[in-house]
Design a protein with these regions (language model features):
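Active-site microenvironment of metallo-dependent hydrolases
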Residues: 165-181, 185-475
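Short coil/turn segments at beta-strand junctions that form active-site/ligand-binding loops
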Residues: 13, 150, 375
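Short, solvent-exposed polar/charged micro-motifs at secondary-structure junctions
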Residues: 25-30, 95-96, 118, 163-164, ...
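Short, glycine/serine-rich, charged loops/turns that create anion-binding
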Residues: 22, 57, 159, 321, ...
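Divalent-metal coordination cores built from histidine and acidic residues
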Residues: 1-80, 385-390
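N-terminal cationic-hydrophobic initiation segments that often serve targeting/anchoring roles
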Residues: 5-9, 45, 143-146, 178, ...
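Residue-level marker for buried hydrophobic side chains located in beta-strands
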Residues: 17, 154, 356-359
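Active-site core of metal-dependent hydrolases
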Residues: 51-191, 196-208, 215-220, 225-231, ...
Length: 475
């Protein structure tokens, strides 16, 4: 975090950073590269570039008033800075309790009704562009209000590099909101003045004397074609080209964060120590993004589950050098049968090494490709690497030029589409980086094993021996 703050200083773009509130996102269910407590948060909030506490994802810890989370929230409140939320699925009394803890915004909007309830609860609602399938419904709900409130803002959330280069970030979200029926001037207001209100920055968001001149010049108010960009009063881009030269990095990049040895096919097995051979009923994770438990009867050979033909495998391996537990593997359902493998070190929110596939040999090849690159993502099919892109900076970022990263990512996504069949809106490439987010309700696989975000349990794959005649049922 300190590196990101230092690296942003002096760039021709204003970076407003927030302190990471949930490292890890689900304590006790996963291990991250560090454990942030109140002391670390206090130190980060003291930095002038840090505007507040980043999204508080551990909703359960807030609602149960866990000492760790109460300490983090108290540090943020004492700093006088804003606290961002992650209130996915919260409603009624639970939403009110979450907001009462000092959290004042949410971007995890799941419907139009959800957006309206959170606005009425006094939260700032941040419409995110990463869930495009929800935006038409949310815009329709907003249009039922007598006015567009100042507490309605806009954000991007995750944006992949090829999309960012081709269509842009915030400007693309605004274009889509306008296309879905939001008045252009209201959309622009949400992204400028309203966002400045949210950040408690009265020096931003206005075209007025005495304010900071972070400005864009548009050729029209519907397609929002950007002609010029000014940052802090300086022209930094014109005609879609930078006019200011970027300086070289001032410090060494944080690399070598893949702290694990190469893996073998034997590491990608669902181990069942309760049974050497025979048949067993085991837990599986059904679905993408919004997951639920299922139970599947499988053959067991030498203490390992035999993969049923309609299921696939998911493996998570701790990569930060803080655990000796080894790879954790689970059956996944609802993804179809993988025809290859995909591995990545970019996996919310602890960003351990995550691998998907059906063939342990191909899964090992994909995983080892990522390990050798020092982080990144790789697609394997027919025991050949179809595509890969390196993220050597913390296993999350590339040091290459944006156009190169965009090209590599596009090839990666196209290759991934050859080994798994996408089914929008949930079974998408984006979902591959979110399946480990154990703070959300339902089952997830982390570096500690099968977890339940609703009950905060870590569960074994083995459920029981089957009844006679075999079975398969939802759990």
């Amino acid at each position: 975090v300190r590196y990101a703050v230092r690296a942003s200083r002096g760039l021709p773009l204003r970076f407003i950073v927030q302190a990471s509130s949930c490292v890890p996102a689900a304590p006790g269910l996963e291990l991250s590269g560090a454990d942030f407590q109140a002391d670390e948060i206090t130190e980060l909030l003291a930095l002038p570039e840090v505007a507040g506490l980043a999204e508080v994802m551990d909703m359960r810890a807030v609602l149960e008033a866990s000492p760790r989370m109460m300490g983090i929230l108290a540090a943020a409140i004492a700093s006088g800075k804003i606290i961002e939320g992650h209130a996915r699925g919260l409603s009624g009394e639970r939403l009110q309790a979450y907001a009462a803890a000092g959290i004042s915004a949410d971007h995890e909007i799941v419907s139009g009704a959800d957006a309206l309830e959170k606005l009425r609860a006094g939260l700032t609602v941040e419409l995110r562009g990463s869930h495009d399938y929800l935006l038409p419904e949310v815009v329709a709900a907003i249009r039922t209000l007598p006015v567009v409130p100042t507490s309605l803002t806009v954000c991007t959330d995750d944006v992949f590099p090829d999309y960012l280069v081709e269509k842009g970030g915030m400007i693309d979200v605004l274009r889509r909101l306008i296309r879905y029926g939001l008045d252009p001037l209201q959309a622009i207001r949400c992204a400028t003045i309203n966002n400045a209100y949210r950040l408690r920055r009265d020096d931003l968001g206005w075209v007025a004397a005495g304010r900071r001149a972070d400005l864009i010049v548009l050729t029209d108010l519907r397609e929002l074609q950007v002609e010029q960009v000014y940052a802090n009063g300086r022209l930094v881009a014109s005609g879609a080209r930078m006019v200011e030269t970027l300086r070289a990095p001032l410090q060494a990049l944080p690399t070598r964060t893949m702290k694990l040895t190469e893996l073998s096919p034997a590491d990608f097995a669902v181990r069942l120590p309760e049974l050497a051979d025979g048949r067993a009923v085991v837990r599986a994770i059904r679905g993408a993004r919004f997951t639920e438990w299922s139970e599947v009867e499988v053959d067991v050979i030498e203490g390992a589950a035999v993969l049923p033909p309609e299921l696939s495998l998911m493996t998570v391996v701790h990569r930060h050098g803080r655990s000796q537990l080894g790879p954790q593997t689970a059956l996944i359902e609802g993804w179809g049968r993988w025809r290859g493998a995909y591995a990545t070190s970019y996996a919310h929110d602890s960003h351990n090494l995550v691998v998907y596939g059906a063939d342990p040999v191909e899964m090992a090849l994909a995983a080892n490709t990522v390990i050798r690159m020092g982080g990144g993502a790789a697609v394997v099919r027919d025991q050949q690497v179809l595509a890969s892109t390196a993220f050597p900076v913390a296993g999350l970022l590339s040091a290459a030029e944006p156009m190169q990263v965009a090209r590599e990512h596009r090839v990666l996504v196209e290759a991934a589409g050859e080994v798994v069949e996408w089914q929008a809106p949930y079974r998408t490439f984006k979902a591959l980086s979110g399946q480990c987010l154990a703070c959300n309700a339902g089952p997830h696989l982390t570096d500690l094993g099968l977890t339940d975000g609703s009950t905060r349990e870590i569960l074994k794959p083995f459920v029981r021996l089957p009844v006679s005649g075999g079975e398969r049922r939802a759990g």
